[in-house]
Amino acid sequence: MRKILIITLTFLFSYLTHANDFEDAKDTIQLRQISMQGIWERVKRLAPFIDFDENLDYSQELAVQDAKDIKLLLEKSKTMWPKSTNLSTKNLTNATPAIWAIEEYFVKLYAEAEIAASNLEIALKENDWENVDLEMCNLGNACGTCHASFRRLLTSQLANEASAWSGKYIRDCN
């Protein structure tokens, strides 16, 4: 009887641990998605400000803050890619398993995005518009390549995400 009780308790503990791990993974995925959406919102606000020399209802101060937020969101979401969040087969994430299969490439692209975001913030603070354009293009290239390589896209999402995937956030990017 004691063996049955031990086996039952072991099974129950294992099940509860697995359930908690699954919930933790789902929470991490949700935080990651919110971070990425926050980055995209800021990119969409920044792009017209950088692209057009018009008096928009958006100031350089807001542009610097958006660049700073992009950098911060990238820093905060950097650790939100543990293997336990590889739940694309359960349709809980659009991140493909390739992230974890070729992790070095993912880390390289992520680092490029972080560097571009940091340099973009500096260029905006210094009114260095040539480098603002360059770093916005670098950010677009890093994010666009990462999305094209590691994000599953459903046909229904194509219209919404085409500009994010192209990596061409401003018109002068090659």
Locate predicted features.
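Sec-dependent N-terminal signal peptides
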Residues: 4-13
